[in-house]
Amino acid sequence: MRRLFTSESVTEGHPDKMCDQISDAILDAILKNDPNGRVACETAVTTGMVMVMGEISTNCYVDIPKVVREVISDIGYTRAKYGFDAETCSVLTSIDEQSQDIAMGVDEALESRQGQKDDVEAIGAGDQGIMFGFATNETKEYMPLPINMAHKLSRKLAEVRKNGTLAYLRPDGKTQVTVEYEDNKPVRIDAVVVSTQHDPEVTQEQIQKDIMEHVIKTVVPNEWLDDETKYYINPTGRFVIGGPHGDTGLTGRKIIVDTYGGSGRHGGGAFSGKDPTKVDRSAAYAARWVAKNLVAAGVADKIEIGLAYAIGVARPVSLLVNTFGTEKIEDSKIVDIVNKVFDLRPGAIIRDLELKRPIYRQTAAYGHFGRTDVELPWEQLNKVDEIKKYI
């Protein structure tokens, strides 16, 4: 059976992604000096203004406006004619400490309060919720092809803008890739969409020619393209007004872009601006780590891992494995393997993936998973041999 599946990505200059990067840059600045800092940092951007708000408990000082302006400058909003300028935008902050009612459950998990002395039990989940991880062998990154290609196109857009190849481009942009599948295997790319902000004087014809030559053709392998592939480059005909001047941005509003592009499920919790005691983030990373190692070990061609937690409790309340009919062994045995090989309590996840480090801003654009341009601990294939012992 043939079907089409589509995923999108956005560039670092998209207003929602700006907010994710600002929130994670503040998180990194705190973790750099206080690895045990508690951070729940949200950002909003609009024309000429940034607002940073949230709950932060730390023993270090961070110059939040300075961090905000550095991020905006790095992204490329450095001129007033872009509608947003790192030097002149206003930065408002409204920060409180983490609620003591939340902190008491995170500082000492229910298991620890009941007398269990394991150090890992001392950390309870920072909230209730469900988190999913996903992996597939259809790309070498163990990611679905549509989101994999969409992210590469978005990164290339930023690259050719920043290195001067296409100096008329501006920071905001979006990409989208539609892949045709036959019997659940990708066989071709059916459509590519690239929308990029640009200077007003450049023509649509020039943009289409340059994007095709310097972005699409350099990113998408020829074997995925054919005479029937459709290309939509700035299909509205003009994209001059963009970034926060064109749309208000918020942290956590690109959760499908951040994960698997719609392949597999999402528990709804965003990542950026959250320290690793928040299982929205750390457990989703762990679920990806589990799924990727299982697929790499040959347990299945495609796996989704579902985890659920209760606030203040260390041990997951449920573990779900879905192999979509691609399993090489029974799903029940896969669950047993996961329980033997991986410790999915928050304290163990933080320990095993070394999540108290300032590593998060680099994840806040172009996806948290399947990255080859940065080293991320949940992407390591360090459990494959151990998994194979139990197959």
Curated annotation (Swiss-Prot):
- GO CC: one term? cytoplasm
Reactions catalysed:
L-methionine + ATP + H2O = S-adenosyl-L-methionine + phosphate + diphosphate
What InterPro entries does the entry give?
Answer: ADOMET_SYNTHASE_CS, S-AdoMet_synt_C, S-AdoMet_synt_central, S-AdoMet_synt_N, S-AdoMet_synthetase, S-AdoMet_synthetase_sfam
| Binding site residues for Mg(2+) | D16
Q: Which cofactor does it need?
A: Mg(2+); K(+)
Positions with a binding annotation for L-methionine: E55, Q98, D247, K278
Q: Where is this region: Flexible loop?
A: 98-108
Residues holding K(+): E42
Which pathway does it operate in?
Amino-acid biosynthesis; S-adenosyl-L-methionine biosynthesis; S-adenosyl-L-methionine from L-methionine: step 1/1
Q: Name one GO biological process term.
A: one-carbon metabolic process
Q: What class of enzyme is it?
A: transferase
What does the cofactor section's free text say about binding? Answer: Binds 2 divalent ions per subunit. Binds 1 potassium ion per subunit.
Q: Which GO terms describe its molecular function?
A: ATP binding; magnesium ion binding; methionine adenosyltransferase activity
**Keyword annotations:** ATP-binding, Cytoplasm, Magnesium, Metal-binding, Nucleotide-binding, One-carbon metabolism, Potassium, Transferase
The residues that the entry says bind ATP are H14, D172, G173, K174, R238, F239, D247, R253, K254, A270, K274
**Subcellular localization(s) per the UniProt record:** Cytoplasm
Q: Does the keyword Magnesium apply?
A: yes
Q: What is its EC number?
A: 2.5.1.6
Family the entry assigns? Belongs to the AdoMet synthase family.
Chain's role: Catalyzes the formation of S-adenosylmethionine (AdoMet) from methionine and ATP. The overall synthetic reaction is composed of two sequential steps, AdoMet formation and the subsequent tripolyphosphate hydrolysis which occurs prior to release of AdoMet from the enzyme.
Q: How does it assemble?
A: Homotetramer; dimer of dimers.
State what protein this is by name: S-adenosylmethionine synthase
What species is this protein from?
A: Clostridium novyi (strain NT)
The organism's taxonomy opens as: Bacteria, Bacillati, Bacillota, Clostridia, Eubacteriales
